[in-house]
């Protein structure tokens, strides 16, 4: 009997390594792959070195696929463009759908593989309406459903998420028991192409001729109160690093790239009850015109708030929260939930009182 073949995306970390082990243990014919996304100096990243060691340890075939050109076009250029437009993007969401899933599923199909798999802390379920949906991992502290909201039904049908039923502690224990070479490797925290976390410096290296220079800090009534370093250095809700002394805490409540202004306000000024999102992906719910009540998260660490969804005539979605939500940020994703299931989500365009 032919074993089902699965291509596992090996990041060089402990989660994807244990995912590969678990799938092999379950009887799958496992192929390990590292997708090379960002290697500006031309040297082999440590992630590739580590993933290769894991594949050798597990005795599975291993390949490195060069997606650097596609990553630059689909993710890095998008990231830069969003910041220049005064928004705060989430490049991981774009990368997940367009590269880690779309491109990897295409390659897997060429190898005769039925599935791809990753080390994300989430699960996939099939709902009563016949649709696939991402649902919360077994341990809420490592839940990664927010980053996967925009996967398509076709992608979900060909995806396995083997560590969604485990806690991080259990994954570490399995890695140690199996003597995986990355068992003690720490988790990565930053955006992979900006490991030092300095977005401003990265943007200046990428598009030095397009970076806006200094501009005015203004109050909500238009009063100029100081100078800022350039709109790409700020995000909605930011309090630290503003370099202005008002005698009390103040926050970034709006970014205006067209006038190179950063609007400063009080804490209450960064709360909103409404947002408009576009690029809506329907996952657990089908596209429909009727209003729907659910929970929504406006950032990865947001626990979620009750809201009503209302599809607009132009295909965008209006999200009305029952109570004001802090720092709704254009460019970030808003993700809709029904209990533990992801209904869908979109990219925040505007926030309104």
Where are these regions (language model features)?
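ATP-dependent adenylation/nucleotidyltransferase module used to activate substrates
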Residues: 1-149, 160, 169-170, 176
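AMP-forming adenylation/ATP pyrophosphatase catalytic core
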Residues: 117-128, 133-353
């Amino acid at each position: 009997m032919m074993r089902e073949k699965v291509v596992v995306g090996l990041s060089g970390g402990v989660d994807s390594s244990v995912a590969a082990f678990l799938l092999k243990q379950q009887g799958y014919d496992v192929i390990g792959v590292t997708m090379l996304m960002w290697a500006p100096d031309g040297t082999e990243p440590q992630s590739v070195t580590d993933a290769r060691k894991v594949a050798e340890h597990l005795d599975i075939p291993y390949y490195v696929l060069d997606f650097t050109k596609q990553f630059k076009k689909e993710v890095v250029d998008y990231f830069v463009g969003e910041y220049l437009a005064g928004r705060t993007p989430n490049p991981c969401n774009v990368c997940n759908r367009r590269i880690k899933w779309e491109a990897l599923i295409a390659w897997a199909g060429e190898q005769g593989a039925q599935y791809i798999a990753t080390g994300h802390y989430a699960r996939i379920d099939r709902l009563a309406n016949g649709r696939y949906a991402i649902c919360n991992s077994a341990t809420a502290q490592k839940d990664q459903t927010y980053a996967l909201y925009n996967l398509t039904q076709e992608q979900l049908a060909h995806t396995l998420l083997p560590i969604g039923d485990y806690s991080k502690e259990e994954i570490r224990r399995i890695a140690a028991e199996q003597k995986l070479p990355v068992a003690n490797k720490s988790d990565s925290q930053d955006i992979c192409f900006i490991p030092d976390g300095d977005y401003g410096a990265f943007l200046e290296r990428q598009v030095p001729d397009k970076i806006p220079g200094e501009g005015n800090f203004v109050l909500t009534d238009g009063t100029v109160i100081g100078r800022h370093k350039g709109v790409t250095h700020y995000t909605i809700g930011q309090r630290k690093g503003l370099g202005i002394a008002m005698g009390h805490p103040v926050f970034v409540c709006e970014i205006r790239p067209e006038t190179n202004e950063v609007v400063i306000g009080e804490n209450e000024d960064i709360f909103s009850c409404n947002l408009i999102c576009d690029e809506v992906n329907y996952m657990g719910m089908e596209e429909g015109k009727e209003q729907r009540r659910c929970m929504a998260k406006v950032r990865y660490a947001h626990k979620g708030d009750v809201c009503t969804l209302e599809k607009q005539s132009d295909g965008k979605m209006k999200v009305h929260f029952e109570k004001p939500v802090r720092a709704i940020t254009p460019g970030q994703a808003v993700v809709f939930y029904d209990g533990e299931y992801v209904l869908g989500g979109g990219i925040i365009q505007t926030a309104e009182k």
